[in-house]
Each structure stands twice: as structure tokens, then as C-alpha cells.
């Protein structure tokens, strides 16, 4: 009976460690996804800002040179 209790305790301990590691890995995967979304939004904002800046510079160049 004592060896059976040890076996159950060992299985419970190993199962708890495995579950803990899986939850940490899942949490790390969730964080990466959020960073990718943030990067995607920032890339979009940067692209729009570059386009607006380029059009403003073209208009300014035309005003200066008299296009």
C-alpha cells in the first residue's frame, strides 16, 4: 500500500510540473501574438505617415519651384 501511495504521489507531482510548463509555454505564445499585432499596427501607422510626408514634400517642392 505504501509503494502505491508513493507511485500516486510521484504521478501527481510529475503531472503538476507538466501542466505548469504547458501553461507557461501557452502564456509565452499568447504574448508573442500580441506583439505581432502591435507591430502590424505600428507598421501601418508608419506607412501612412511616410505617404503623407512624401505628398506634403512634393507639394512644397512644387510651390518652391513653381510646378
UniProtKB/Swiss-Prot annotation:
User: Propeptide ranges, please?
Assistant: 23-39
Expression by tissue = Expressed by the skin glands.
Q: Mind listing the UniProt keywords for this protein, alphabetically? A: Amphibian defense peptide, Antibiotic, Antimicrobial, Cleavage on pair of basic residues, Disulfide bond, Secreted, Signal
The organism encoding this protein is Odorrana versabilis
Family statement drawn from the similarity comment of this UniProt entry = Belongs to the frog skin active peptide (FSAP) family. Ranatuerin subfamily.
Predominant cellular place of this UniProt entry's protein: secreted
Is Oxidoreductase set as a keyword in this record? no
* Matches recorded under InterPro entries: Antimicrobial_frog_2 (IPR012521), Frog_antimicrobial_propeptide (IPR004275)
Q: Report what the protein is called.
A: Ranatuerin-2Vb
Q: Where found? A: Secreted
Q: Which GO terms describe its biological process?
A: defense response to Gram-negative bacterium; defense response to Gram-positive bacterium
Its job: Antimicrobial peptide.
Q: What range does the record give for the signal peptide? A: 1-22
Question: Which positions form S-S bridges?
Answer: 62-67
The question of whether Signal is a record keyword is answered with yes
Q: Any one cellular component term from GO for this entry?
A: extracellular region
Amino acid at each position: 500500500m505504501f509503494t502505491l501511495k508513493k507511485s500516486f504521489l510521484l504521478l501527481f507531482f510529475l503531472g503538476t510540473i507538466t501542466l505548469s510548463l504547458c501553461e507557461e509555454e501557452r502564456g509565452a505564445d499568447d504574448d508573442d501574438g500580441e506583439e505581432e499585432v502591435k507591430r502590424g499596427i505600428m507598421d501601418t501607422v508608419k506607412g501612412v505617415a511616410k505617404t503623407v510626408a512624401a505628398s506634403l514634400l512634393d507639394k512644397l517642392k512644387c510651390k518652391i519651384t513653381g510646378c
